[in-house]
UniProtKB/Swiss-Prot annotation:
Keywords: Extracellular matrix, Secreted, Transport, Vitamin A. GO terms for molecular function: retinal binding. This is Retinol-binding protein 3. The keyword Secreted applies. IRBP shuttles 11-cis and all trans retinoids between the retinol isomerase in the pigment epithelium and the visual pigments in the photoreceptor cells of the retina. The keyword Secreted applies. It is found in: Secreted, Extracellular space, Extracellular matrix, Interphotoreceptor matrix. The gene is RBP3. One of its GO terms (cellular component) is extracellular region.
Length: 23
């Protein structure tokens, strides 16, 4: 089963930040 891994969270956060393009 897939567990909620910190690495996955960080990767998703990076993508979200890149998409939203926060200053």
């Amino acid at each position: 089963s897939h567990l909620f891994q910190p690495s996955l969270v960080l990767d998703m956060a990076k993508v979200l930040l890149d998409n939203y393009x926060f200053p």
